[in-house]
Each structure stands twice: as C-alpha cells, then as structure tokens.
C-alpha cells in the first residue's frame, strides 16, 4: 500500500467518529488493550501527560509539549482531530509522523485491526504509542478522544493528568 491507499483503508474500513457519529464509538478498553498487547505494549515505554476536558485540550496539549521540548525532553504529542493532514495527530518534537511510518504500521497490523474491529481512534492512538516508543520519546502528551473512563487513551498510566 502507498500512503493514499493507507488513508483510504483507515477512513473507509475503520469506524470514524467524525464521519459516522456515535455509531463509530464502541465503549470498552478491550480492543485497544488487546491490540497494544499484540504490538508489544509500546505505551509503557515513556512517561505520559494525559489531557482531558471539554474545551482547550488541543491548545493545552500543544503548549505542554512545547514547554517540555524547550526544556530538552524528547516529546511526543497525540491530538485529534486533524485539520488538513492525518499526520498532524502524531508528532515527535513538533515534527509530524512520516508517511512511510503510517504505511508500514498499517501494512504490518491491518489484519489484526480488522480482526479486533478497532475504531479509527483506537488505531490512531496505538499508532501514536508505537511511533513514540520507536522514536525514544521521553514524555508524551496524550489528548483524550471522547473522554470518559472508556476512552481508548485510558490504557496509559499518566505521570500527570490535566483537566481543562
């Protein structure tokens, strides 16, 4: 698959909340937990700051990531939704995930994604965790999706939680 084909798979084969609304949301942490176990639990390889709340999550997440980066930490940032480019969601030290990393991850794991019926958000979170671990991130700032106790990002064990 190339990058365009990969995005077509992601947006057409996995339930996307922005396109399908509540029908894309499947409560529970079982799928993301099983998938992250399948890929080696990468979310355990770095410290996390978990950002939740009604408004301002993205702005606060970007500010925290910028401060950490300026302080010399190798920093991951996971936010949603993206505005123009899917890769905006996943950054290391301010740089978007390379297209080829997205393609390689989906090529390698798409069978398991389909088998577990991962949502688009669950897959995106797992991709971020995997990329952060591969990139030797020291601290990752993780923005919740829909929030609540069953949000896919709740498989992390945060060093700090922030509510906006």
Model-inferred region functions:
Residues 22-29, 34-44, 70-156:
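ATP-dependent carboxylate-amine ligase catalytic core
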């Amino acid at each position: 698959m190339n990058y365009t084909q990969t995005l077509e798979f992601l947006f057409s084969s996995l339930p996307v909340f922005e396109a399908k609304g509540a029908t894309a949301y499947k409560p529970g942490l079982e799928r993301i937990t099983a998938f992250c176990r399948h890929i080696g639990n990468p979310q355990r390889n770095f410290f996390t700051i978990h950002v939740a709340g009604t408004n301002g999550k993205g702005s606060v997440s970007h500010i925290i990531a910028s401060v950490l980066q300026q302080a010399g930490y190798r920093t991951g940032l996971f936010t949603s939704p993206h505005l123009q480019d899917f890769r905006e969601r996943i950054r290391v030290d301010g740089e978007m995930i390379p297209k080829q990393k997205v393609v390689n991850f989906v090529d390698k794991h798409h069978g398991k994604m389909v088998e577990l019926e991962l949502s688009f958000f669950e897959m995106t979170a797992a991709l971020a965790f995997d990329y952060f671990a591969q990139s030797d991130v020291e601290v990752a700032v993780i923005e919740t999706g829909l929030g609540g106790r069953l949000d896919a990002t709740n498989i992390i064990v945060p060093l700090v939680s922030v509510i906006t």
